[in-house]
């Protein structure tokens, strides 16, 4: 895989790793997320509640910030377990880029995003909600037709995934 490249998207927000950390608006952050695809081709997404620091009451990806000193895989595993109660293995890295966005305090700041993807052999009933209003598999047509209020990062990333060869492969018979 090549080194991450810079991309610009508008309106993406971020939260701090913890209350004592410098907020992501003031530093570079590493963000590890995943997209699981079920047998119907539906995507596992999180509906954030009104208390979320990032994109309240919007739909987003499962995952979050990798803590200082934590490696990417451990950060993803921790975030997924905290949010869904799931243990994930065998995912493939689909997206690995540095994304510049507002509301960073400087144009020299950007977040490094990694998104892992894979087929899911779980259902909504297997999810143990640890964060947000709900985490469920969502019909991709709801993303395409705009009927879900997506967070800015999700609005930027998920349509690209749905148009990718990777999504086509994951939704083909035998995946």
Q: Where are the regions a protein language model picked out?
A:
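Conserved hydrophobic "DFG−1" position in protein kinase catalytic cores
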Residues: 36-37, 45, 120, 137
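Unchanged
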Residues: 65-90, 99-153
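A generic structural micro-feature
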Residues: 25-28, 55-58, 107-112
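Charged phosphate-binding loop/patch that engages nucleotide di/tri-phosphates or the phosphate backbone
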Residues: 153-175
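Acidic, metal-coordinating catalytic segment for phosphate/diphosphate chemistry
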Residues: 2-35, 39
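Conserved Nudix-box catalytic region and its N-terminal flanking loop in Nudix hydrolases
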Residues: 42-82
């Amino acid at each position: 895989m090549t080194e991450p490249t810079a991309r610009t998207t508008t309106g993406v927000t971020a939260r701090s790793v913890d209350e004592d950390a410098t907020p992501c608006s003031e530093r570079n952050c590493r963000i590890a997320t995943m997209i699981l695809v079920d047998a119907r081709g539906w995507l596992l997404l999180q509906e954030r509640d009104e208390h979320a620091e990032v994109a309240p009451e919007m739909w987003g990806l499962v995952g979050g910030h990798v803590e200082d000193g934590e490696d990417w895989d451990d950060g993803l595993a921790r975030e997924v377990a905290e949010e869904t109660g799931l243990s994930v293995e065998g995912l493939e890295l689909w997206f690995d880029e540095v994304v510049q966005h507002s509301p960073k305090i400087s144009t020299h700041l950007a977040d490094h995003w990694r998104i892992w993807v894979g087929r899911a052999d779980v259902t909504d009933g297997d999810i143990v909600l640890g964060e947000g209003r709900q985490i469920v598999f969502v019909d991709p047509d709801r993303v395409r037709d705009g009927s879900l209020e997506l967070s800015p990062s999700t609005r930027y990333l998920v349509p690209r995934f749905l148009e990718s060869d990777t999504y086509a492969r994951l939704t083909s018979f035998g995946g």
